[in-house]
Amino acid sequence: MTPEPPAPDTASRDAENLDAAAAQQRLRKLHSKATRLKLDLHDLAEDLPIGWEGLLDVARRTYDAYAEIALLEGLAEKETSR
């Protein structure tokens, strides 16, 4: 059994209403944010057990950023295949 994806946040729900240019701009910002979060998660993991309390929060935000990237890229792919 695969886990259910998290409920989409407001940005994810609004992603379907973006035009192509706005979606590309959003994707660029999300890629930057996701990369920063990935590095934060890596740094936090290196310092374990110090700072373990923040691990789940950073992991969730990283997951959410990459989930939204996947959503936007999937929508962009649908648009180009029409």
From Swiss-Prot:
Cited Gene3D superfamilies: Helix hairpin bin (1.10.287.660)
Keywords recorded for this protein, A-Z: Nitrogen fixation
Pfam families per UniProt: Rop-like
GO biological processes: nitrogen fixation
Similarity remark: Belongs to the UPF0437 family.
Identification of the protein by name: UPF0437 protein in nifX-nifW intergenic region
Organism: Frankia alni
